[in-house]
């Protein structure tokens, strides 16, 4: 074991989602665990490998434009060495695969809490994952949210459908434009003998 290192929970406001959920008194937050000057977090993707990633601590811009840093919460300290933490994160990656992500049942806050419990024996504050907690108590709440928020597969399906629709619209517009050009060319290119 090594020197005591602070274990910090970095919390980010997901304000695009909060526009919908704040009306029912629930905030939606992303979180990551900072230790040794590195921040580990979990997110979804449609593939069966680890969804754990690393960002610069507190840097919301690395998460995307819809995230805003909210606060840092000191959870405790750990004696694990940095190499040990890398191994722990790698092991957690077997459980926290990208395609296992679910907003209510296995999200970034569940990961942060699991890592925090290993590193310093403490869960994250309950208010950070309140939406998931309420969803387990009030199952219909999940049905009120857009399905593409819940899993990466649903999001990918939604995005794929939107892209397909846009592609079809572009093809239709191009075909209409080509037909209009051909019709205009046919009218202006007509010569009559007198």
UniProtKB/Swiss-Prot annotation:
It comes from the Eukaryota. It catalyses: Thiol-dependent hydrolysis of ester, thioester, amide, peptide and isopeptide bonds formed by the C-terminal Gly of ubiquitin (a 76-residue protein attached to proteins as an intracellular targeting signal); S-hexadecanoyl-L-cysteinyl-[protein] + H2O = L-cysteinyl-[protein] + hexadecanoate + H(+). Interacts with RPS7. It comes from Mus musculus. This is Deubiquitinase DESI2. It is found in: Cytoplasm. InterPro entries: PPPDE_dom (IPR008580), PPPDE_sf (IPR042266). GO terms for cellular component: cytoplasm. Widely expressed.
């Amino acid at each position: 074991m090594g020197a005591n290192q602070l274990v910090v929970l970095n919390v980010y406001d997901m304000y695009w989602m909060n526009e919908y959920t704040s009306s029912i008194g629930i905030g939606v937050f992303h979180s990551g665990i900072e230790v040794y000057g590195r921040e580990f977090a979990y997110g979804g993707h449609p593939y069966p490998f680890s969804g754990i990633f690393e960002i610069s601590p507190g840097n919301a811009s690395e998460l995307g434009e819809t995230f805003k840093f909210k606060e840092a919460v000191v959870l405790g300290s750990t004696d694990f060495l940095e190499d040990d933490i890398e191994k722990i994160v790698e092991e957690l990656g077997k459980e926290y695969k990208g395609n296992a992500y679910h907003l209510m049942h296995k999200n970034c806050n569940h990961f942060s809490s699991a890592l925090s419990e290993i590193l310093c024996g403490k869960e994250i504050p309950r208010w950070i994952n309140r939406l998931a907690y309420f969803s387990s108590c009030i199952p219909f709440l999940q049905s009120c949210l857009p399905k593409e928020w819940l899993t990466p597969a649903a999001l990918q399906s939604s995005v794929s459908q939107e892209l397909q629709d846009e592609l079809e619209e572009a093809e239709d517009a191009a075909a209409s434009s080509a037909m209009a050009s051909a019709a205009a060319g046919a009218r202006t290119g007509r010569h009559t003998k007198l």
